[in-house]
Amino acid sequence: MSSISDTVKRAREAFNSGKTRSLQFRIQQLEALQRMINENLKSISGALASDLGKNEWTSYYEEVAHVLEELDTTIKELPDWAEDEPVAKTRQTQQDDLYIHSEPLGVVLVIGAWNYPFNLTIQPMVGAVAAGNAVILKPSEVSGHMADLLATLIPQYMDQNLYLVVKGGVPETTELLKERFDHIMYTGSTAVGKIVMAAAAKHLTPVTLELGGKSPCYVDKDCDLDVACRRIAWGKFMNSGQTCVAPDYILCDPSIQNQIVEKLKKSLKDFYGEDAKQSRDYGRIINDRHFQRVKGLIDNQKVAHGGTWDQSSRYIAPTILVDVDPQSPVMQEEIFGPVMPIVCVRSLEEAIQFINQREKPLALYVFSNNEKVIKKMIAETSSGGVTANDVIVHITVPTLPFGGVGNSGMGAYHGKKSFETFSHRRSCLVKSLLNEEAHKARYPPSPAKMPRH
């Protein structure tokens, strides 16, 4: 694994050359990344089709479009973000210059995820490059076709010493984590997030951890159930449920459970036809291990829709479970698959209590026509982010930082927040060497008596 040490050393030496300090250089590299994407859309969608069964349109909409938007925003706004930020002066510093200067951290490690292997690897990179860092990318080996593609394309378009790709599995990642970085960005499971954080602690390296959890979705009786169920079905079953901010389960009053089931079924038919297996818009589970895990969560449950599978193609039908026991296995772990449990609660207060008795999720969703219900849900729970009357879309807005809290992660990125995450905000005070008389009082010897105010 000596090559990994050599790779990190190469990135460090390139960073130390100082070339990334130039704003013009950073923008040139971001524009090169833009070209890389636009000139290789077919290859990107092909890799996503091989890894996750996505079609060309889905690949672009779910993965590529948000990265291109992030690049557009960053290239346009970077000169303003990088400006020194003046701060308020005290009585003693009226003649001084006080400001915060954003400087690059150094060498950043980005460990990508397999479920959105393009977006969740490249989007963090945008912020790291914008902030002036060298970047080492570690794509997930689980989505191997995308890992191969990124390793091929990035050196063709970007500086070959500053922006490097390391392929491989657990051994390579383990060796990478022994190296000293200036920031580590990891997207994935909470269990591995703890390993990353422990490794980073040995070097006092700061981390951004975008993890997961069971993101709840509360459906109030006072809402348009047709619209609510259509939006929930879209967010839950896109990418075959393999989305870190997908609604994991529904909380609702028992009186509307059957209506929700029927309206979800209608939406699924509208989206994927009578047989989702034949739909070009419905994905597949990433590998056999995850297929067996998700399939096992359906066992001994009351299936209201779906529940079928085909192991040969790693297909699991869109599945709805009703009257789910909160203690059952499907409610003990993040599902990360096309299985939607419905848990009945008899009030908003009971729903809030249910959510607060569990780990803080990455996202929380609430559907209601009543603004007081929405405000109460937000005020009395905690999650990485919230969307009311829709799902997932809060993470697509560049001006809203995306990140977790507690077990669902720490730190955030997207838009300006990415630039800030990968920058050191350096406090600066510049004083004149003149007017020394005004500073006499601070020097020894001190007076025998305290001055009166």
Curated annotation (Swiss-Prot):
PROSITE patterns (alphabetical): ALDEHYDE_DEHYDR_CYS, ALDEHYDE_DEHYDR_GLU
Protein role: ALDHs play a major role in the detoxification of alcohol-derived acetaldehyde. They are involved in the metabolism of corticosteroids, biogenic amines, neurotransmitters, and lipid peroxidation. Oxidizes medium and long chain aldehydes into non-toxic fatty acids. Preferentially oxidizes aromatic aldehyde substrates. Comprises about 50 percent of corneal epithelial soluble proteins. May play a role in preventing corneal damage caused by ultraviolet light.
Assigned keywords, A-Z: Acetylation, Cytoplasm, Lipid metabolism, NAD, NADP, Oxidoreductase
Main location as per UniProt: cytoplasm
Residue positions, PTM N-acetylserine: 2
Binding site residues for NAD(+): 188-193
One GO CC term, this protein: cytoplasm
Name of the protein: Aldehyde dehydrogenase, dimeric NADP-preferring
Biological processes per GO annotation: aldehyde metabolic process; lipid metabolic process; positive regulation of cell population proliferation; response to cAMP; response to glucocorticoid; response to hypoxia; response to nutrient; response to xenobiotic stimulus
Any Pfam family: Aldedh
Entry's EC annotation: 1.2.1.5
Residues at the active site: 210, 244
Induction: This protein can be induced by a number of chemical carcinogens during rat hepatocarcinogenesis.
Family, similarity comment: Belongs to the aldehyde dehydrogenase family.
Compartment list: Cytoplasm
Residues annotated with N6-acetyllysine modification: 178, 194
Entry GO MF terms: 3-chloroallyl aldehyde dehydrogenase activity; alcohol dehydrogenase (NADP+) activity; aldehyde dehydrogenase (NAD+) activity; benzaldehyde dehydrogenase (NAD+) activity; oxidoreductase activity, acting on the aldehyde or oxo group of donors, NAD or NADP as acceptor
Known partners and oligomeric status: Homodimer.
